[in-house]
Amino acid sequence: AADAAQLNGTVSLEDYYSGDTASGSRHAMTGRLRLDLTKAGSSEKFAFHFDARQRLDLSGESSTSSKEGRIDQAQLEYAGTSLYLSIGRLWPKDMPIEVVDGVNAFYHGPKTGVGVYAGLRPNPYSQSTTADFTSAGLYLSHAGEKLTAGAAFVHNGYKGDTDRQYFYGYGTWTPIPSLFALGNITADMSPSGEIDLTNLIAELTWRPDEVKSFTFGYNQFRAFKYYASTLFADINDSRQDAWYLGATYRLAQKYTVYGRVETQKRHFPAVESGQNDMLSYRAGVSGDNLFNTGVFLNLSASITDSYDSEYKSYSFDMSRMLGESFQLMVNGAYTENVYGAASSAEVTSFGGSLFYMARRWNMSLGLDREQGADYTTSRILTRVSFNM
């Protein structure tokens, strides 16, 4: 049965270069390795997952360079009929809100499960293993035909003291095929036991048929605090609220007209009242297989009155498959910015990408250029990957 073990993975190398006439150049290379060994052992219930990257900064003077590496995942897991166990650097199963160097246990029935995890929390700045940061949590999850939901309580520590404690919940609901709702919520608990709403996302989409859809949403984001590991635990609360309404309409099975309006309000103690509100409008049209040429085209325009500034932007992007393995993409944009009483600033950008996609090999080359009033930025991004 050991012969049934399966190994999959990806090896990739990415090279990024940007040259800016105002701030100089930047050059970096990133290598990444991802491995997934599944159906291991005589029971075929063991697996090993590994994901790591190494970044080499080549922007230094006199050919000097700096390295930055990190391991995102390195875990050994057992997946039984009802019991799941994992050890290593991991994201808790069905509740990937914290990464830990530790253990995770999850017991589940046909629809509902309960899990617990505990371990060392990687250093948030370097992602290295350290005993200074810790994390533990207890969570529940449910996956039904119409409802999926989860709830968790998380404790983060720093050198033996409480760094952060918070509640987290998420859910999706499809009461009828044409209606879909989603949301998640985070509430932080202070050392004194007070509970404050930190983040809230709620969205409702109504799609009565294959032609049109309407979406309404609300977001709230508040700065949360680390009470032990930073010097800024007494920073004033700041909050940002956003409401948005979007709609799409399909024409002749080829074209889609869409629009979105969004308003935001900031509650920042240090910000003047005239800089607290934002209103944005965006509209566009996209088309598939234009004139039977295989070309996809998207045109959009947006107008934003944002915190004492105004933005107008017009953009396009188009793509076409060249045979079965190549895809060509071209894009461009023009933006006009007005900051208060100052004169307007214009920015023009354009670029293109070429993708090669095969069973095991994927390669891409991307070029773009951005032109402002007093600067020019050019970027080149190349990437090659091999699928095992």
Residue ranges of predicted features:
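Gram-negative and organellar
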Residues: 2-388
